[in-house]
């Protein structure tokens, strides 16, 4: 074609576009929307794929940041080099091999073995990319390339369309027997994640065609960046952590294949993450973040500290990369900041992510509350570059405060990227970034039946884990969390300066039928049915006072109780009534404490107990004393119940609560404090005082009084003039405040605190109805008082704040 003809063709094409007609390759003319063409034409930019690859490697590996004089980096390098060398040495290389590594032999029948194998290849590739490695020899490069090629030809890339058909039949139970070891997650997320990482790491060892060839099967198993379960014929919208994971896989696939449309779609899918779950959501639509900061996964399990952490880490990996693409994220930073402030931070104390938010992950020995918290802090540092200056400073202060709050572990041990270690070192050495003061914070997660409380003055945190018709008692799938029976039955957590209490083998060695705050039959239920009750939740007044209630029934529906918890600044009141069992062979037991005995002396009514005191006796107080006052724990019993104290040594194995964990014995000694109930003793009331000296604890023995302890109506009062209660009944209930009658006209939790001689500050919440400021008059009444200053507490807490004014 001559230059003149080319010019004519170009001019003609422009003319055709301007008139709304376009010529296709076969010469056909078709009418089109010329405005749409103009928009698409001006907006399309070619991504810099090399820059995107570099950004991904910088964020997740940080080779350029490696400093061999940094001991944490050197330690990390040596460990990775050693592991990769062993994997290379152990790799099967014979021509008749049917697997690459022992421990992952069943590549056709167990999908986790496929993912494990790809992860092993990824680990080798990660080490070989380091400038100081001795592993990047001609022989080893050939070895890893052959391993990648073998897995493509014999496993993941072997007729993927047929594999999807087989997986779909298996999922529907059309195979005999059904193979439960084939998991969609491995085909759509686990293996593709390891594979795409590996291909980017091996960029200098593979041609572009080889990389595209090896990544090609991903689009068969996971064709969409916002869908999961495609590999098993049940494609559905991805939510929460799964949406981040699948969009991340497709983002990396698009970079490898240099597919601009896939790149844009993956970013569009990622942007869908930044939404809140709707109140009307059902089934899997309930997965994700709620406006009160709750995070749900698997439809009904609180999972901020596990899947929520995975989501946050995924966001921190993707946002720096998206920033370098032509398609900027449209997500509102305010949404992400809200998740961090309301969802994550109230659950973290002294560098520890509270176990009440970690689901079945508590049964994994090496996936601790500290590793979860460390991942959050790492993610905050990564996200810094995408935030405004004030948010950057605030996040840095949060991270520095968290890392410095616990010297029992090294944060850098939990950082895999050299760039993360470099960022952390820079932050810790930055004298312009100060630590935050201790926080006074009270957070009620009514959408996931959890409560957290941080007391600034006494430096402790308290947690509460409940269950309702909306929230599971616990999760025990994939052979994990096998003894989580009662972890959602009103279990209370006390976090203090004894930072290792829950972290060091607690879940492997504690008596899981005797968890603090719970009322049980000391049983090991064989079923995991939900609590059918919906009256579970709480309300708060500022960040010091709260009233929480749970209408409780056990798994077998043989035990019921009304269980209330009242947070009153420096103390927490536990009050229960209506404890009834239809199982005549078992008496209900309320567990007051189950604490590791190491470092403590226990005093019962001021007498030290050195062995088990199995004879239940009327008891006024129990006090656990440590050399550190902040670790002290005291209990006052208001109705002189018969209390049993045991000091026992427990031996357990992580494999007993998680089939995939180690079988070696772990041993700990515990103090167990319990109250046994019967038909004539169907209630309890005790007050927890953390962090006090023994003399201060004794002086508090009359600080709380019971106003009402009826079967369905609880009210307590403290010496600061705070009244807190729960009405479990649909009937009107009343009580007196200094001769003034207060009427509760419907079910609900409430807190009332005297403001001055003419007014009371109040809060109210009913988990079974919509709580609005407009109808609060129909819920509470004091003759001669008018309700004023009505407001919903805030957008993140259910409940109504108001004042009663004379």
Predicted regions span which residues?
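Aromatic-lined, polymer-binding surfaces characteristic
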Residues: 91-365
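Low-complexity, Ser/Thr/Pro/Gly-enriched N-terminal "stalk/linker" regions
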Residues: 40-114
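Gram-positive Sec-dependent secretion signals
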Residues: 1-40
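N-terminal functional module detector in eukaryotic proteins
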Residues: 54, 166, 576-578
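Alpha-helix boundary/N-cap detector
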Residues: 43-47, 51, 68-82, 112-115, ...
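Surface-exposed loop/edge segments in extracytoplasmic proteins
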Residues: 786-789
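C-terminal beta-strand-rich structural cap/linker in extracellular carbohydrate-active enzymes
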Residues: 447, 682-687, 791-806
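Extended polysaccharide-engagement surfaces of secreted carbohydrate-active enzymes
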Residues: 318-331, 336-773, 777, 781-784
